[in-house]
Amino acid sequence: PPTLIIADIPGIIEGASDGKGLGFQFLRHVERTRALLHLVDVSLPDEDPVTQWRIIRDELASYGEGLEERDTLLVATKVESEESEKRAQALFEAAGLTDGLMISSVTGRGLEALRHRLFALTYPEVSDF
């Protein structure tokens, strides 16, 4: 069966494409990826998930190397309340998605769907995972 290699790149912050923090170092790692999985925490009432998503998209575009054109799966995480579900819907609407994926590690919500979507994104030629 096909396998996935997943690299967690947590250090992309606003200004990363200008070298802020460990920006270049992390963005060089992203260059080697086949696809991007963008996890956005929607549980925090004081954080705007749309802004967080846009910051990362802008940094990828500013860095260049075609990163903003990579196949990307946008996932709302920590969706465990009605409020977080509303924030997830706003995120997907801003991203122009009709099929955004909501997950929760606590409840297990959407985890199997995430696995399927990751394999489909990475191995589009394989139909059964």
Language-model regions, residue ranges each:
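Switch I (G2) and immediately adjacent beta-strands of P-loop GTPase domains
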Residues: 1-16, 35, 41-42
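Short loop/turn elements that form and flank the Walker-type P-loop nucleotide-binding site
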Residues: 1-3, 30-33, 67-70, 96-97
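A general structural signal for well-ordered alpha-helical packing
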Residues: 3-6, 23, 53
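Structured core elements
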Residues: 5-6, 36-39, 73, 101-104
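A short glycine-/small-residue-rich loop at the edge of a beta-strand within enzyme catalytic domains
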Residues: 13, 17, 27, 43-47, ...
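Amphipathic coiled-coil/heptad-repeat helices and related helical stalk/stem segments
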Residues: 19-23, 84-87
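Inter-motif core of Ras-like GTPase G domains
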Residues: 21-44, 60-67
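C-terminal-of-GTPase-core extension/linker across diverse P-loop GTPases
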Residues: 45-129
